[in-house]
Design a protein with these regions (language model features):
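Bacterial Sec-dependent N-terminal signal peptides
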Residues: 1-28, 210-214
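Residues on the lipid-exposed face of transmembrane beta-strands in outer-membrane beta-barrel proteins
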Residues: 27-31, 50-58, 70-72, 101-109, ...
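Outer-membrane beta-barrel channels and translocator barrels
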Residues: 20, 61, 73, 112-116, ...
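Predominantly the C-terminal beta-signal and adjacent terminal strand-loop region
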Residues: 71-81, 93, 158-162, 168-214
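Short glycine/proline- and aromatic-enriched beta-strand/turn motifs that initiate or cap beta-hairpins
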Residues: 22-53
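Early exported N-terminus immediately downstream of N-terminal targeting peptides
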Residues: 59, 63-77
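Extracellular/periplasm-exposed beta-strand and loop segments of Gram-negative cell-envelope proteins
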Residues: 36-45, 75-100, 130-168, 172
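Residues that define the transmembrane beta-barrel architecture of outer-membrane proteins
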Residues: 44-50, 97-103, 117, 167-171, ...
Length: 214
C-alpha cells in the first residue's frame, strides 16, 4: 500500500509539472538474468529471459528527469537436479518461468561526459503483475508442497498451478549511457514481495537493455 501511494504521488507531481517539462519517448529491449534472493533461495540459479517495453521521459532540466515505463518481462529461476530444500525439493532439473507486466518509475540523473554522450544514473520503485508463465520439470519434484511427477509443465500463477503471487513490487537501480538517441543500460531489480506464501524467496533480476529515444 505504501509503495502504491508513493507511485501515485510521483505520478501526480509529474502531471502538475508537465507544462514545464520536455517530453520524449523511447523503446527498449534486452536480456534479463533472474533468480531468487532471501529465504530458501539457496541453490537458485540465474535464468535468462527477454524484456521489451516503452517509456516516457519528463526532463525537468539538463540533469534531472522522471521516466515511467511499461515492460513485458520474463523472469524466474532454475534449480538443478538433486536439490532438497523447504520450498524446492527436486530429483529433476526445474525451470520456473514468470511473465510480468512491469511499471518502473525512475528518477534519472544525467551527466555529460563527451560530445553528444551522457552518463545516466537511475533509481526508483517498480510494480509488477504476473500475467503468465510455466514451470517445467524434467522428472519428479515438489514446489511449495505441490508434487509433480515426470516430465511436465504447469502454470506458475493460479490455483491450478504453483499458486505464485501475481503481485510484485520492489526497487530498481540502473546505470546507462546515451549516445545521441541510442540508449544502452544495465540495471538490477530487488523484489520486496515473496514469490509465494510461506517461507518463500523474493525476485531478483539483472537486466541489459538497448533502446532508442524519439
Amino acid at each position: 500500500m505504501i509503495m502504491k501511494k508513493s507511485i501515485l504521488t510521483v505520478l501526480f507531481a509529474l502531471i502538475c509539472t508537465m507544462g514545464f517539462s520536455q517530453v520524449s519517448f523511447n523503446v527498449k529491449a534486452g536480456l534479463n538474468l533472474s533468480s531468487y534472493i532471501g529465504e530458501n533461495s539457496d541453490h537458485s540459479e540465474f535464468k535468462p529471459g527477454a524484456r521489451i517495453g516503452v517509456g516516457m521521459e519528463y526532463q525537468f532540466n539538463d540533469m534531472i528527469s522522471l521516466q515511467p515505463s511499461l515492460f513485458f518481462s520474463q523472469r524466474g529461476a532454475k534449480y538443478s537436479s538433486g536439490f532438497d530444500g523447504n520450498i524446492i525439493d527436486a530429483d529433476a532439473d526445474v525451470k520456473i518461468n514468470q511473465l510480468y507486466l512491469e511499471l518502473p518509475v525512475n528518477v534519472q540523473f544525467r551527466f555529460n561526459i563527451a560530445d553528444n554522450t551522457n552518463l545516466v544514473i537511475a533509481t526508483g520503485p517498480y510494480l509488477a503483475c504476473g500475467v503468465g508463465g510455466k514451470a517445467k520439470f524434467d522428472g519428479d519434484a515438489s514446489v511449495g508442497g505441490i508434487h509433480i511427477n515426470g516430465d511436465d509443465k504447469i502454470d506458475t500463477f493460479g490455483d491450478d498451478g504453483l499458486d505464485y503471487n501475481r503481485s510484485d513490487a520492489g526497487w530498481n537501480i540502473g546505470l546507462g549511457v546515451e549516445f545521441g538517441k541510442i540508449l544502452v543500460g544495465l540495471d538490477t531489480q530487488l523484489g520486496f514481495c515473496k514469490v509465494m506464501d510461506g517461507d518463500a524467496p523474493h525476485n531478483a533480476n539483472i537486466g541489459i537493455t538497448l533502446g532508442y529515444k524519439f
